[in-house]
A protein has these predicted regions:
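H-loop (His-switch) and adjacent beta-strand-loop-beta switch element
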Residues: 421, 427, 443-449
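P-loop/Walker A nucleotide phosphate-binding surfaces of NTP-dependent enzymes
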Residues: 2-375, 381-397, 409, 419-425, ...
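Conserved Rossmann-like nucleotide-cofactor binding loop
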Residues: 438
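ABC-family nucleotide-binding domains
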Residues: 402, 408-409
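Walker B catalytic motif
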Residues: 372, 403-404
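H-loop/switch region of ABC-family ATPase nucleotide-binding domains
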Residues: 433-435
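Conserved hydrophobic alpha-helix in the ABC-type ATPase nucleotide-binding domain
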Residues: 415-416
């Protein structure tokens, strides 16, 4: 053990504005990099230490695995010795996708779904609820005492909006894309012959103009001068087959054919149903608008997933509560259970409360679990990363923190300090770039650039 390296040795660092820097960085301690803007703080932290730490770890994996992962390029440095595997908690974490929420990102939703699977009142198909029972966890048959119908208690997976518990209409996104009628004819002074109906120009054959004429619509009159009946045919007309005579625009070719009418709205809906990639979506999305799903009211959950009740509220309502309020509500669950259910309830609830603690310490108690992760600020997403890092209980990792105090209320600085100390206690190393003096004072070592 006496020969175990105590420092990372960096020699000849030339990344960005670093000019042949040599520096030793103590391991298993908090090291802060300070300096004026442009001095190379982030270049040393991210461009050298994180880049080399993550790259070398990935290079130790098999070729098959590396092909499926993106790795950093080799840093411009003569030598880096004894750098551990590195994880970066970026100042600007990547924006999550549409299916990610505060609840999924923190994994709090996993515990909450387990509560609703094991501890909830479940109901039969006739709407009769039964009290919480150990028979659910034991996977025993449950019969409604009122109508004698068999009761199905959904599993945690059946309560997940990214899986079996998804709303059938929106697919678990909470939003639906519908045709934006105003986008179909953007310039209402044009005639149909002049290309007034935009989807027919980009998503459909141009001869749809000829079919529309056969439907009884005047195609040589400005759209804003057409009758309501003609406009209705353009927007919503029936899919009737018409015999048309058509002539190509740029040649003398002409002919007759039977063609089915696609109204402007259906043209977009049909194109949307056939989208297979981002390129295809870009052609269609300009004719769409997003609205809250009318089926699930934005909760993302199916009707069945919203049925189980704990303390008289469903999973959807629990996810809408701010974390501060939700924690207090969860604390009351064990005492609301029948005596034989209380030990299991405490175990499940304690798991939720344990994960919540760090998030509350980091000042995220105002967020609800259903908050779309894409709407979170960069500071909020970074604090989620920090809380997850502590929960994972890793050891021997170099954590590179790029301005972790950004967006943090002064009252929550000590929560951040507690997180960093926990990471060190578990045998990790921290390298941070920050301007907050309270954070910098906690460092064991300073590197002044």
């Amino acid at each position: 053990m006496g020969n175990t390296p105590k420092k990372i040795k960096v020699r000849g660092a030339k990344v960005h504005n670093l000019k042949n820097i040599n520096v030793d960085i103590p391991l298993n301690q908090i090291v802060a990099i300070t300096g004026v803007s442009g001095s190379g703080k982030s270049s040393l932290a991210m461009g050298v230490l994180y880049s080399e730490g993550s790259r070398r770890y990935l290079e130790s994996l098999s070729t098959y695995t590396r092909r499926r992962m993106t790795s950093a390029t080799k840093a411009q440095v003569d030598e880096v010795l004894y750098v551990p595997a590195a994880l970066a908690l970026h100042q600007r974490p990547a924006v999550p996708g549409i299916r990610s929420t505060f609840g999924t990102g923190t994994e709090l939703l996993n515990s909450l779904r387990l509560m609703y699977s094991r501890l909830a009142k479940h109901c039969c198909k006739n709407g009769h609820y039964i009290e919480p029972t150990l028979n659910v966890a034991a996977e025993k048959e449950i019969i409604c005492p009122i109508c004698k119908e068999k009761i199905h208690a959904p599993s945690a997976e059946e309560l997940a909006f990214n899986s079996q518990g998804a709303c059938l209409k929106c697919g678990g996104t909470g939003i639906v894309r519908i045709v934006d009628i105003d986008s179909l004819v953007p310039d209402k002074t044009l005639t149909i012959d002049e290309g007034a109906v935009a989807p027919w120009n980009s998503l459909m054959w141009t001869l749809m103009t000829d079919v529309c004429r056969a439907m009884g619509v005047r195609t040589d009159v400005p759209f804003n001068q057409l009758t309501d009946e003609e406009k209705n045919i353009i927007y919503y007309g029936p899919a009737e087959k018409k015999h048309i005579f058509y002539k190509a625009k740029n040649t003398d070719h002409a002919g007759e054919m039977d063609f089915t009418y696609f109204n402007a709205t259906y043209t977009v809906e049909n194109a949307l149903s056939k989208v297979k990639d981002d390129k295809g979506m870009k052609r269609v999305e300009k004719f769409l608008k997003e609205e809250i799903c009318p089926e699930c009211q934005g909760t993302r959950l199916s009707k069945e997933a919203r049925k189980p009740l704990i303390r008289e509220i469903g999973l959807d309502k629990a996810c809408q509560m701010p974390l501060n309020d939700l924690v207090e509500w969860v604390r009351g669950i064990p005492d609301s259970m029948p005596d034989e259910m209380k030990p299991m309830a405490r175990e499940i609830c304690d798991s939720f409360l344990d994960v919540s603690k760090r998030l509350l310490d980091l000042g995220l108690g105002y967020l609800s679990l259903d908050r779309a992760a894409s709407t979170l600020s960069t500071g909020e997403r970074q604090r989620m990363q920090l809380a997850r890092a502590v929960r994972n209980r890793t050891t021997g990792i170099l954590y590179v923190l790029d301005e972790p105090s950004i967006g943090l209320h002064p009252s929550n600085i000590y929560g951040l300090i507690g997180v960093m100390n926990d990471l060190i206690h578990d045998g990790n190393s921290i390298l941070l770039v920050d301007h907050d003096t309270e954070i910098i004072k906690e460092a064991n070592w300073l590197i002044e650039m």
